[in-house]
Amino acid sequence: NFLGRDLNTLTEFSEKFRKETGLKFVLSGTNPASIEEEKMEVLIRGGLVRIKMGFESGSDDVLKLFKRPVRTKQLRRAAETLSKFRGKMVAPAFEMIVDNPFESNEDLYRTIEFLDDIPGPFTVSMFSLQFMPGTALTEEVDDFKTVEEHIDKEYMFSYKPTAINLFVSIFAIIKPSHFLVKLIRRMIAGREDNCYPLIKNILYKL
């Protein structure tokens, strides 16, 4: 986590990087809790043009399951800080995990509400949960078939074709209006298994 370094270290790096290379750079794998306005100002002066970070979910229950060091309160604060730098860098990318067998539809709706509520601009990258042998999360799964389905699959661009996954993916294209988010939820709530074509049609028209 590059941003975990203290402000003096980041200032020294930023000045040297700008003077010696003149290049632009992107930070990936950033811990949302390390996003601070002063640090962002320093790094943008040094050439930072984008940040990518794992938000994983907008549900505190799911973040706890993943043993993430942050909760939605910290994620929201990070998004609010980054939104202050719109126009100074490319919209940040927030990475979300889907196809989680421990996650309920309500958890997914919390993620959608979270994305709807935080300030833009931002983009969303979706990753299908992949169980890795020997990890703590895999050990919690009782059904081997569930694990088998998730092992060795392509975790990018292969999430399940469900209405809620498509709903989340809208945020990868645009930040829809509050009205549209509420309307779509009202249209599919309780009928998620049958609404994939409907959300797909909406997505194609955006």
Can you annotate each of these PLM segments?
Residues 1-93, 98-100:
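Conserved SAM/AdoMet-binding glycine-rich loop
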Residues 103:
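Catalytic palm subdomain of template-directed nucleic-acid polymerases
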Residues 91, 106-206:
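C-terminal accessory regions of radical SAM enzymes
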